[in-house]
Design a protein with these regions (language model features):
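Extracellular/oxidizing-compartment recognition motifs
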Residues: 2-183
Length: 183
């Protein structure tokens, strides 16, 4: 079992736009996975001191500030987890519907300003970008969403909070497709 943890509201990262000014600590996991097999047998997998952690290609994630992904990182170095003391109080589930992609939008218009491309979606929408690119190892792509543009075609984030952006660092291994996972 592998689990990818993001910061969420629990550990709001600074350095970019964020609404919360507090952090409750690093991402933490308490897992009890109940499995019922086709033959009726059951198994429970729980997170404990035997689990391990490793870095991921996601080097920054914030609900409001964006996400950075370095496709060159493929860590195979595993470390023992740090077992934390259980919080006080009664553990209650937090029920939430999954985030689903409801619709894909194509770019309505592409504008160029020097080495910067501006992709106009043709409407205001809530969503996240997905890119498919091919390039050299270590090349960086920065995606800055905005509701409006300045007169010189720069992103204007005054209405939405700033700075908010995504970066993707290419692995250089052929065609690469990426979209943020945690923002």
């Amino acid at each position: 079992v592998q689990v990818l943890l993001g910061n969420g509201f629990y550990n709001e990262q600074g350095g970019r736009y964020h609404k919360l000014k507090v952090s409750f600590g690093p991402p933490t996991l308490l897992l009890a996975l109940h499995i019922t097999y086709h033959d009726g047998s059951k198994e429970t997998i729980v997170s404990d001191a035997a689990w391990q952690w490793s870095l991921s290609p996601i080097t920054f994630n914030s609900l409001y500030g964006g996400e950075d992904y370095d496709a060159r990182i493929s860590s195979t170095t595993w470390h023992p987890v740090v077992v934390q003391q259980a919080p006080k109080g009664i553990l209650r589930p937090q029920l939430a519907y999954p985030v689903k992609v409801m619709e894909h939008y194509e770019v309505a218009q592409t504008l160029r300003r020097d080495s910067i491309l501006v992709f106009d979606m043709g409407q205001n929408l809530a969503g996240f970008p997905e890119i498919t690119v091919k390039g050299k190892r270590g090349q960086h792509i920065k995606i800055t969403p905005a509701e409006t543009l300045t007169d010189d075609l720069r992103c204007n984030q005054k209405q939405t909070g700033r700075p908010h952006y995504y970066t993707y660092t290419l692995s250089g291994k052929g065609t690469e497709t990426w979209h943020p996972v945690f923002s």
